[in-house]
Amino acid sequence: MAIITTDNKHYRNIAAAIREKTGDEATYTPEKMPAGVAEVYDAGKQDERKEFWNNALMSESDWTRRFAGSAWNDNTFRPTKDLKPKGGSFQMFSGCKITDLAGILRECGVTLDVSGEDWRVDDMFSSATLLTTVPYLDLRNASWGNSTLNGLFYGCTALHTIEGLHLNEDGNTTWGSSTFLNCTALENLTIYGQNGQNGLNLSWSTKLTHDSLMSVINALQDKSGTGTPWMVTLGSVNLAKLTDAEKAIATQKGWTLA
């Protein structure tokens, strides 16, 4: 029990209550009581936060719009355990006001593990206009017809870094028409796995680094000899960043760079 330097039973009871709530063993004087009460408040808020996140993340299926909308920002999005969506992640963060998603997850000591999602991830971050960074996303198991990644980052006008986008190793991950639509600030993009589908359009992202563009080219699946037209749209600004030899890596695999 906490100690107080007075025989006043009332203060002793308050000190005991503070210790019970905070786990502190400090000696409390009347002058220190306000600080102790503040500690109780903070401890209560922490308990409230943990209870909320445990309840919010209790469902193991259907993460549709779980963190969508303007109420989710850098202050309200403070997860206490790993996020492992499955059963559908359509518009999971759509329209949120979170900025540095990758940084917040690291600060909270948790991860966003999408590897178990075997259904929809389209529009997952759509219209999240303040979003600047996205962590590594393992999308190898995601599948939604011809538009698995459609609108994934649509309208993310502040997004400059995607730490990793892991496509299916067999090249079957489909893009849709607006995966990177209006991603005008995007600089850093790393592609893992193989891109074996038409539809990738990065022409809006004119700030992409050379390394990012080479990551896209190196991830192209070898389609040489298939007799089918295959195309990746990079746009004239991005094409100007590549040498003829680098472009040839794509063409030798049967791809046209537009």
Q: Which role does the model predict for each range below?
A:
Residues 238-258:
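Extracellular/surface-exposed low-complexity segments
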Residues 23-24, 110, 254-256:
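Short aromatic/hydrophobic-glycine micro-motifs
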Residues 13, 148, 212-215, 245:
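Extracytoplasmic/secreted proteins, especially bacterial periplasmic and envelope-associated proteins
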Residues 1-79, 85-87:
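Surface-exposed receptor/substrate recognition regions of extracellular proteins
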Residues 49-87, 94-119, 126-146, 154-173, ...:
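Structural signature of tandem-repeat unit edges
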